[in-house]
Curated annotation (Swiss-Prot):
Sorted UniProt keywords: Cobalamin biosynthesis, Lyase, Methyltransferase, Multifunctional enzyme, NAD, Oxidoreductase, Porphyrin biosynthesis, S-adenosyl-L-methionine, Transferase
CDD domains for this protein: SUMT
Protein name per its UniProtKB record: Siroheme synthase
Residue ranges, annotated region (Precorrin-2 dehydrogenase /sirohydrochlorin ferrochelatase): 1-206
Binding of NAD(+), residues: T22, V23, P43, K44
Gene from which the chain derives: cysG
UniProt function note: Then it catalyzes the NAD-dependent ring dehydrogenation of precorrin-2 to yield sirohydrochlorin. Finally, it catalyzes the ferrochelation of sirohydrochlorin to yield siroheme.
Similarity comment text for this entry: In the N-terminal section; belongs to the precorrin-2 dehydrogenase / sirohydrochlorin ferrochelatase family.
Residues annotated as catalytic: D255, K277
Family matches, as SUPFAM superfamilies: NAD(P)-binding Rossmann-fold domains, Siroheme synthase middle domains-like, Tetrapyrrole methylase
This protein's pathway: Cofactor biosynthesis; adenosylcobalamin biosynthesis; precorrin-2 from uroporphyrinogen III: step 1/1; Cofactor biosynthesis; adenosylcobalamin biosynthesis; sirohydrochlorin from precorrin-2: step 1/1; Porphyrin-containing compound metabolism; siroheme biosynthesis; precorrin-2 from uroporphyrinogen III: step 1/1; Porphyrin-containing compound metabolism; siroheme biosynthesis; siroheme from sirohydrochlorin: step 1/1
Length: 473
């Protein structure tokens, strides 16, 4: 390592900033947030530094830095020079470096005893990223990625854990025991309660665990289930929360609509169980899947149930949750981008457009025996954009039903195969030719049927879409 990563406590310590511009103001802001007494030496101040002065957060010496000025300034713990004058910057470095006071000259690593990293601030948690001064831009790129991955609620979580640290130490005397306790707690429901502001519930979980340890001498493993919407196929469309929960799961249950790349995002050591279904062939009955979730959670395991699209849109997620509730199994449901939303965008047309459609109907094309049939009369007269899930097999019935109830046979229809994936294929036809097109092109599931005038917009949008370089039309 070129630099030792270290966090310094500078509260109520004097720190010196030489320079009054934008860069200097941003450095001063870090000192201010850390509670330092900040002195600024500059002949004039920019807008940001003037704001700090107006807030009473800095002490300003309206001078150009010189060695003669040093005796008038309090001895600083840290010094940053951020001016456009290289002679001034060099003078600052030589003056304070000779006194064994750490100095940083902005953008000149050869004159830096310390460097300031890119920071992800979740105070009291702080994450620092450094490239050793080689590429501040790369450090900022990494910071941006971490900002999206780490919820702001981690500040609440960190504070909560800190408040209970001594309490846990009083109950669990050995270090290994405390380590196990915190590792278990911080990979389960507790962390999500705290991060999302449910501190009361988080504290109740923590205290219940401690009470169990007091009474039994050990904490009983408590499993939980995550019903995660994996989105329509493209791994980049997975939500951050879904990814975070997937990566802490001990067991992953998945179906055929989940992309292999998404499955690979789970922990390498996690057990993977395929529970997918195909028409006329079911790997596992839905009731058995529901019970498996309960059984695995009762073994103390964290179970991720990955479902294509969104769990509550033709995903039978509610059936799984009902049984979890009946058995008092803790669970979370993570929404996913449903196929209708994702596939239409990747096929270069919207689902609504004020010139064509003001509403959308999501319809299952696979009807359960005994279920109420599709209301073709309402759909044909509604003006909705119609999206049929699992509708390939029943396309002839869908086509006939809509035409019989008055929908124009020339209404555009789109068939999206493997939507949002690299092998996506979009076929545009008319309602009158829908079944013929599916048969002629040997189209197989997974595929989405979209019927509506809004598909006409595709020709205009497709000309400039960056997605055209990613997926074939």
């Amino acid at each position: 390592m070129d630099y030792l990563p270290i966090f310094m406590k500078i509260e109520q310590q004097h720190c010196l900033i030489v320079g009054g511009g934008t860069v200097a103001a941003r450095k001063a802001d870090l000192f201010i947030k850390s509670g330092a007494i900040v002195t600024v030496v500059a002949p004039k101040l920019g807008n940001e530094m003037t704001f700090h002065l107006a807030q009473g957060k800095i002490i300003w010496h309206m001078n150009t830095f010189s060695t003669a000025l040093v005796s008038e300034l309090p001895r600083p713990s840290l010094v940053i020079s951020a001016t456009d004058d290289q002679n001034v910057n060099l003078a600052v470095y030589k003056t304070y470096h000779a006194q064994d006071i750490p100095v940083n000259v902005a953008d000149q690593t050869e004159y830096c005893d310390f460097i300031l990293p890119a920071i992800v601030d979740r105070s009291p948690m702080t994450i620092a990223i450094s490239t050793g001064g080689r590429s501040p831009v790369l450090a900022r790129v990494m910071k941006a990625r971490l900002e999206t991955m780490i919820p702001h609620g981690f500040s609440v979580l960190t504070d909560l854990v800190g408040r209970y640290r001594q309490t846990v130490k009083n109950v669990i005397s050995d270090i290994d025991g405390r380590k196990t306790f915190w590792e278990t707690l911080l990979s389960g429901l507790f962390i999500d309660k705290a991060v999302h502001g449910n501190t009361g519930e988080a504290e109740a979980l923590l205290e219940a665990e401690l009470e169990t340890i007091k009474n039994n001498g050990q904490s009983l493993p408590q499993g939980e289930v995550y019903i995660i919407g994996a989105g329509p196929g493209d791994p980049d469309l997975m939500t951050f929360k879904g990814l975070r929960l997937l990566q802490q799961a001990d067991v992953i249950l998945y179906d055929r609509l989940v992309a292999p790349e998404i499955l690979e995002m789970g922990r390498r050591e996690a057990e993977r169980i395929y529970v997918g279904k195909k028409e006329k062939w079911h790997k596992m009955d839905q009731k058995d899947i529901n019970q498996m979730l309960v059984d695995l959670a009762r073994q103390g395991k964290r179970v991720a149930r990955l479902k294509g699209g969104d769990p509550y849109i033709f995903g039978r997620g509610a059936e799984e949750v009902e049984l979890l509730v009946q058995h008092d199994v803790p669970y979370q449901v993570v929404p996913g981008i449903t196929a209708a939303a994702g596939c239409s965008v990747y096929a270069d047309f919207p689902l609504t457009h004020r010139d064509y459609a003001q509403s959308v109907a999501l319809i299952t094309g696979h009807q359960q025996a005994g279920a109420q049939g599709i209301d073709y009369a309402r759909l044909a007269q509604s003006g909705d954009t119609m999206v049929f899930y699992m509708g390939i097999k029943n396309a002839p019935k869908i086509q006939a039903g809509l035409i019989a109830h008055g929908l124009c046979p020339d209404t555009p229809a789109a068939i999206i195969e493997n939507g949002t994936r690299l092998n996506q294929k979009v076929t545009v036809t008319s309602l009158a030719k829908l079944s013929e097109t599916i048969q002629k092109k040997s189209i197989k599931p997974p595929a989405l049927l979209v019927i509506g005038e809004v598909i006409k917009v595709r020709e205009r949008l497709q000309k400039k879409s960056l997605l055209d370089d990613r997926v074939p039309a």
